[in-house]
Structure formats: C-alpha cells, structure tokens
C-alpha cells in the first residue's frame, strides 16, 4: 500500500491479490486435470452458472468435483435438476439404479456436499436437491473438514465459483442483490422496530420463523481462506447458523450440531462484539432463508462480491450509516469495526477555505465498469483509518493512537469507568503512563496553537487512578470469538511494558499466556529504571494485578536462556514467543578511567536504589553524564540517595536537551547544576577511585546529515572534581544466553532484526518488541508495540493466516493545524488547569509529590478540548450492517433506511427479471452521461 511505501516498507509487505491459488491446491489440480472424465465435465456444465462457458478439465467446475465425486455419483446427479427437490424413488428412476444403491450414493454425496436435503412438502417427506455451486455445494464441500484437508483444491474451487460467475454481472445488479448469494441484515439494535422497517430486515423475524430449528457449523469462508493461506486472523469456528431444513442437513451430514435459541443469540452477540457482519442467504425469495452467517470481510466470499468489484448492491441492506458531527469525538471505534472502510476519521474543524469536502466512492450506476474499477486489494484498503486530510493531532501523535477525544468527553460526563475501558482498548497501563508519559499528544494538541495544550495526560491520570483501588478494577473478558479459550500457549519473555501489553491483549483474545521475568517482580524498566518519585510501585502493582486477575501467569526469577531455554519451552507446548526484555544495560563512554571505582552506569544505579532504606546509598560529589530523561532521573535519585551535590553535563545545549522540559525544570528546582555543550574526555582517578572528570567543549552534536557525530574544541576543557560519575548516555540490550540456538539475528547495536510490520524475527515463532527492537524509547512506544505483536502472534499460531493481509496498519495522519479557521467564540476560554504538589516535610522524598486533578478540574480542562476530529461515512461504501452503532459510546452514528428497495429478496431463478430492467436503465444513464 502507498502508506507502506512511504514508510520504506515496500519490500517487506507482499501484496496478495484476490485470485491466489493455494500451493497444495495447484498440485491437486494438476493431477486431476491430467485425466478427462466426461461425466464430471457434464456435471460441471450442468451446475455452473457461468454464462457461455464450455467446461474443460482446466475449469474449476471440473477439478473442483473430480477429486471427490465418482463417475457413479455423477450419473446420479446428472439425472437431477439444479435446485429441484426429488424423492429417492424419482432419483433412482432417473439414474436407472436400484433404490437401495441410489440411497447409498445420495447419502455419500450428501456427506461430500454435492447433495442437500429438503422436507418442504405437505407430508414432510425427505427429498434431495442438487444445489448450485454458490451458495451451495462448494460451501458444503468445504464444511466437510476432513475432506478439505485431503482435497485442498476444494477450497480453491469455492473461491473461484464465488467469483468467476459474477465478474461481468455485478455492475448490473440492482439493490437487493437480485437473488444472488447473500444479503446483509443489520444488527437488530441498530434498527429498532419502526413503521419504516419491514420484518425481513430483522434477525428476530427469521429466528422466530424457524423457531427451535437451528444448527451451528464451521464457517466455510474462514476455512477456505485458511486452507488457501489467505487467512486474515479471523479464525474458523462454529459461527454459521443453519435454520429449518438446513439445520437437519448440517447435523445429519456431520457438519454441525443442533443449537437452542440461547446458543444462537450468544453467537450473534459475540459476532457483533468481534465486528462480524450478519448476512442471510438470498436465493429463495422473501419467504425463505437457510442460513445466517457472521462474516469477516477479510475472508468472506459473499462480502467480496461487493468489495472486490466495488458494487455495494451485491451486499448492502436497506440502511446506511450517518454521523452526527456534534456528538462524534473521533474515538475511531466505528472506523476500526467498519468492514468496508466506509467510516473513516476526518476533521470537524473548518479549514481557511471552509469545511473539508470528503470524496465519495465511485459507483457503477452511470459509468462503464470493468476490471480497472475493481479493488483487488480491498482487504488492505478497507483497513485505512483516515482520509488523506487527516484527523485529530492528539490521536495521530500518540504512538498507541489512544482515543483522546473520546476519553476526555466521557470524563467530562463523569463516566470514568467507561473512559477507562476506552483507554484500555489501546493502552492497558494508563496509570503508569499518566505518571511518566512523554505526552506527544499534548505537543501536537491544536489548542496549543491558541494558548496552551489541553492537559490530556492529567485527565488520563485522573481516569486511571479510579482503578488503583482494588474494588474498582476493570477486568476485561478473556474469551475468543467462540466464547472459549484458544489452546495455543504463548510465552512472553520480559515483564516490561511491551511484554505485559502483548500479554494483556493476547489474553483478551482468549490465549493462555505466561510471562517469564528474570527479576523477582514484574515491571521491567518502569519498575527498575524509573525512580519512585516519578512512578510509585503501588501504581505499577495495581495495573499488574489486573493482568493476574485476567489469568496471566507470572514466572518471576526465571531467566530464559540460563534457567530454561526457548527450545525447552517449545517442548512444554508454547507455540510462540515474544521477546521484550528491554534495553536494561548501560552504555560506556569509551574514555580513560571508566573502570575506576565510583563510575556506575545510570540504569544500574537506579536498579540498586531502594527508597525504603533510610541510609544513604551514595556519598559525595556526583557528576551525571547525559542529558536525557534517564539522566535527569539518575541525577534526582542521586540527590535523594545521599549525594552532597549533583551536576549534570551533556553534549546538547539547553534547548536541544533530549530530556522533557518539565523534568529539566524539576532538576533545576532541586538545585541540580546542568552544564550544557560539554563532552567527557577523561575520568581522573587516584588509587583506582574517581577524583574528577575532564570535559571538552562540544561545538556540534550532529553533522549536516543529522547523524550523531559530535565535534569538539579540544582547547576548551572543563574539570569537575567529584567522587562519583554516573553514566547515562544510552542503554543497551543484554541478551545473555536467551537467543542461543535460535536463528534470531542482531544488528550491530545489538537490537534485533525483525519485520517492521509484524515484528517477526528470522525464527518464525519468535517475535520481538519494545527497546530490544527500536532501542531505548518511551513506555507508550513499547505498549503500542506489544499490541501489534499480539496481532502477529494471533495470526501466526493459526496455520494458514497471513501476518499482513488485511491488517490494520494503524496509520493516523494529522490534520493541517496551519490551515484551520478557529473562531474566538467557538471554544472555552478557560486557562489550562494545573496540578499542585503534595506537601511533604522532606522535599527530596522518594514519594511522588505530584497531585492529580480534582473532579472539577477534569471537567474544566475537558471543556478546553476543541474536538478536532470526527468520523465521516461514505454512503457509497456503506453496506448498512450497523456494527458501527454497537461501538459508539456517544450516540453519534445511526442507520437510516435510505434504500428501501435493497430489501427486495428474489429467488435465484428470477434474477434476470431484476437484472435486465436495471441493466437497461443503467445503459441509458451511461449513454446519456456520455452524450452530455
């Protein structure tokens, strides 16, 4: 995709097109095509609905049947008419076989999937039907699990027969689908009974019609794509609901089990929770369906009919979604779950040229339509989150892309737990981040162009502190799409923010997860590398406790590579590994005297400090080398640990220091001296102990290309006498024996090589994230990486699923803040709220003295938000499934019955009666437009 190319990932991301054939299927096809069986050719020709095609051994109608259908079975089927019920005796007479042999063959053909049953007659006697291929026998063949594994070409057969017959006809199909395939039926809650709606638009109508006659079976589309290697992370399971006679057929042929209404309703609810589209069969008119499917756009052949060909009439319901902009807060939940990419994030604020005008998808109604109009990469393109003009800068800037506007609005309404749940869809550790986040969202905040940015992090901190009390903790559900647990065990190595984030989201998906941590307590660098006056241990413990309550196992004091190897963990049943051990080692200066007593790596110093001890941990004059946030933490900790005076020295000038501005100010308030633009030259020693350090003037930190390449004036030096030198000039990954015996490869700086989209290493079952991949960054970066790893691992442990196909790449471009027209009377003019420090007798306590907003301050600060972003729905892309309405917490998106004719359901045999008039009108429109 274009966004990948812009990130330089074009060589990594392999685009997959809609007509891929599975490798195993190709091999089977070749064998089947080598022999020409006339009866199979005749049968394929009889059933196919491809107009004008003469079936040969090279066609799917042949090789899709040849591997599973015997010539004798073909003789029976050739004596039947497509979709015409026949009794056993009638079939036996037509094929000129005994009733006993015919019954035996029909039973075998039913198990294969070539024949279905029917009891819709006066005395409810059993009849047999030769169904069409799709929907029909191609699906039934794939629903036979053992068969599709032995004959993978059946999966390719299903794929092609759901596509090839439609390639020319789809632009001419009117609303309602003309009796072809499937039809979207909205989420029931999205269309409450009103005078406008009709009965067939409600799932409840169909469930009542087939009361007490339900069966549940595996999704043929998900299985087909998995067999073909084109799974998109939507795992097959009991998601398809057969009704009426189809329920009996599924059970009698071993394709499913009977279900009561409670099980059916639970399946429908889980489908909506997971973003699956409800569809009903649409080949029998308005009085009959035989299945309710719960479809994922990445794998569903029925949804593909509208998405590949860009012809929404093939799928859409009578409804379309629309947004009330004043209520929308651009949280992105509707966008995330929209199957067609109709809902995208845009902006609410006007530009200097007026409101943004968003493009609408081209439709085939008035233009010629051919392959050049198709979207062969619809599975990827439907995952694009934003219009090119961008959305709220806060969401864009946050590495985890938190729904900032959303949780601010919920907080303003006093809905604090709802706000917490919304935050945790992207960040399981908001209290931790509330204390230590680098606040990229605030740096980007549009309000900052007027006066001061909204205090986003303080609002989040207030929300997160609601669950620091054990009774208030939000424990998410930990079940998969079937309401069960997956069997695949996942091992996380490293209990830092990346590892615990991956564990959280994997557990939310229903995976059994264990975290291996070499330290005695989980937390990683946020526990061992951040002083408690910035992040108190009880804050970490409260959020870690949520993971424990979710059932995540913590195996602390276990160093993988030393105490147990990855191979031994494989033998224990772990199917994938996520390495997130952080950059826990320090970097050396590379100067004389660095090995002297009194020289300590900053990160090692932070690990050793125990704030509960009253005795000093360090004595004398202390110099901290470095200018980043960790260096500031080291300096402030040294002061609390007993240093008589602390001096920071760094290469950068004051304006260029990597440390956050507020952290620099806090250091200065504590009388820590900061010397800028100096680089270490030599550590002075006496008797093996530090006595001082010599610096040289730094004239430039980076070269003309922006690369780190410090330049010095060797004639301008400075000597500082000291007893300790704490080195904080970067961090390194300490691998130990962790990756010995694996194929994992490292970069020269000891970070790991991995795919930039999936984080998969050269060892397929090992994924990485956080500082081991990026080098030292912030906690929020690691948290975001952990969630991405969850998606990759989820796909990896299920054979046949692509790690990239149909994947949401989480691209959220920012709107142009320089092109906004913000009227002075359009926003609240209140100043930014400020937190005050807690009073303490000892100003150098290890306690965090920063306070949290009051509830009143939260409401005042929330009112300062400009509400930059909003969802925009393209009506030409919307298929009226209603999933968006189930995700919105703000009553901002609704369905309206804009296309009532889309509820017209026809029998398959009558499709041309609908297509021909519509086709004629379309041709007239095209000609009129051309002449005009």
Residue spans of the language-model regions?
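Single conserved hydrophobic/aromatic residue that forms the stacking wall/gate
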Residues: 1-16
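Flanking helices and flexible, charged tails adjoining ferredoxin-like Fe-S electron-transfer domains
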Residues: 340-393, 408, 454-456, 460-489, ...
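Ferredoxin-like iron-sulfur electron-transfer modules
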Residues: 67, 97, 128, 279-292, ...
């Amino acid at each position: 995709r274009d966004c990948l190319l812009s990130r330089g990932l074009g060589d990594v991301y392999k685009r997959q097109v809609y007509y891929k054939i599975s490798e195993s299927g190709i091999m089977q096809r070749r064998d089947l095509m080598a022999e020409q069986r006339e009866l199979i050719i005749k049968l394929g020709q009889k059933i196919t609905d491809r107009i004008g095609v003469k079936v040969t051994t090279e066609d799917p109608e042949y090789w899709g049947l040849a591997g599973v259908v015997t010539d004798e079975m073909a003789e029976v089927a050739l004596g039947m008419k497509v979709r015409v019920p026949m009794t056993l005796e009638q079939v036996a007479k037509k094929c000129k076989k005994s009733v006993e042999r015919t019954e035996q063959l029909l039973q075998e053909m039913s198990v294969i999937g070539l024949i279905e049953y029917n009891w819709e007659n006066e005395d409810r006697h059993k009849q047999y039907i030769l169904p069409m291929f799709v929907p029909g026998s191609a699906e039934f063949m794939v629903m036979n699990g053992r068969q599709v594994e032995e004959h993978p070409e059946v999966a390719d057969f299903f794929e092609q027969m759901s596509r090839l017959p439609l390639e020319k006809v789809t632009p001419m199909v009117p609303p309602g689908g003309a009796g072809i395939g499937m039809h979207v039926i909205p989420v029931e809650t999205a269309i409450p009974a009103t005078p406008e709606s009709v009965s067939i638009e409600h799932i409840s109508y169909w469930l009542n019609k087939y009361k007490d006659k339900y069966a549940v079976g595996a999704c043929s589309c998900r299985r087909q794509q998995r067999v073909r290697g084109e799974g998109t992370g939507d795992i097959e399971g009991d998601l398809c609901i057969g009704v009426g006679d189809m329920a009996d057929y599924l059970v009698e042929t071993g394709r499913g089990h009977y279900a009561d209404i409670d099980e059916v309703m639970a399946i429908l609810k889980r489908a909506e929770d997971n973003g699956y589209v409800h569809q009903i069969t649409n080949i029998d008119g308005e009085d009959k369906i035989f299945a309710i499917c719960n479809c994922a756009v990445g794998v569903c052949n029925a949804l593909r009919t509208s998405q590949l060909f860009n012809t929404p009439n093939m799928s859409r319901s009578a409804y379309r979604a629309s947004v009330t902009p004043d209520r929308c807060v651009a949280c992105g939940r509707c966008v995330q779950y929209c199957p067609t990419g109709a809902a995208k994030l845009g902006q609410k604020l006007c530009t200097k040229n007026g409101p943004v005008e968003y493009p609408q998808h081209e439709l085939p109604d008035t233009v010629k339509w051919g392959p050049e109009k198709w979207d062969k990469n619809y599975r990827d393109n439907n995952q694009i989150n934003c219009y090119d003009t961008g959305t709220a800068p806060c969401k864009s800037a946050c590495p985890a892309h938190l729904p900032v506007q959303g949780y601010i609005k919920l907080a303003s309404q006093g809905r604090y737990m709802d706000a917490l749940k919304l935050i945790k869809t992207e960040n399981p550790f908001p209290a931790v981040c509330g204390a230590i986040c680098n606040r990229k969202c605030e740096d980007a905040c549009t309000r900052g162009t007027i006066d001061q940015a909204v205090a986003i992090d303080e609002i989040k901190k207030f929300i997160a502190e609601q669950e620091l009390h054990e009774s208030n903790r939000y424990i998410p559900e930990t079940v998969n799409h079937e309401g069960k647990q997956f069997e695949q065990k996942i091992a996380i190595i490293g209990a830092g923010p990346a590892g615990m984030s991956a564990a959280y989201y994997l557990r939310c998906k229903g995976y059994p997860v264990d975290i291996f941590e070499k330290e005695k307590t989980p937390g990683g660098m946020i526990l061992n590398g951040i002083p408690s006056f910035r992040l108190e241990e009880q804050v970490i413990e409260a959020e870690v406790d949520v993971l424990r309550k979710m059932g995540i196992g913590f195996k602390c004091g276990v160093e993988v590579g030393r105490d147990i190897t990855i191979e031994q963990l494989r033998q224990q049943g772990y199917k994938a590994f996520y390495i997130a051990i952080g950059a826990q080692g320090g970097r050396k200066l590379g100067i004389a005297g660095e090995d002297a007593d009194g020289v300590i790596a900053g990160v090692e110093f932070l690990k050793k400090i125990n704030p509960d001890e009253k005795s000093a941990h360090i004595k004398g004059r202390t110099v901290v080398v470095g200018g980043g946030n960790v260096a500031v933490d080291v300096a402030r900790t040294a002061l609390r640990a007993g240093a008589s005076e602390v001096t920071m020295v760094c290469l950068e000038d004051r304006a260029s220091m990597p440390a956050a501005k507020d952290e620099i100010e806090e250091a200065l308030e504590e009388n820590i001296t900061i010397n800028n633009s100096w680089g270490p030259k030599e550590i002075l020693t006496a008797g093996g102990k530090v006595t001082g350090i010599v610096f040289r003037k730094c004239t430039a930190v980076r070269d003309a290309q922006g690369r780190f390449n410090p330049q010095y004036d060797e004639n301008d030096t400075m000597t500082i006498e000291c007893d300790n030198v704490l080195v904080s000039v970067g961090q390194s990954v300490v691998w130990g024996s962790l990756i010995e015996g694996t194929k994992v490869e490292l970069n020269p700086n000891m970070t790991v090589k991995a795919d930039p989209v999936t984080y998969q290493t050269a060892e397929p079952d090992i994924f990485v994230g956080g500082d081991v991949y990026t080098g030292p960054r912030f906690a929020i970066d690691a948290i975001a990486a952990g969630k991405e790893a969850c998606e990759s691992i989820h796909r990896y442990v299920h054979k046949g699923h692509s790690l990239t196909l149909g994947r949401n790449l989480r691209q959220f471009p920012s709107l142009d803040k320089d092109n906004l027209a913000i009227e002075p009377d359009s926003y609240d003019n209140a100043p930014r709220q400020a937190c005050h420090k807690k009073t303490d007798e000892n100003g150098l306590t290890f306690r965090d003295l920063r306070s949290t907003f009051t509830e009143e301050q939260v409401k005042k600060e929330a009112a300062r938000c400009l509400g930059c972003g909003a969802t925009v729905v393209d009506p030409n892309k919307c298929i009226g499934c209603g999933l968006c309405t189930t995700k919105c917490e703000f009553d901002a998106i609704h369905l309206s019955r804009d296309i009532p004719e889309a509820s017209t359901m026809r029998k398959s045999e009558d499709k041309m009666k609908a297509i021909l008039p519509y086709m004629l009108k379309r041709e007239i429109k095209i000609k009129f437009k051309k002449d005009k």
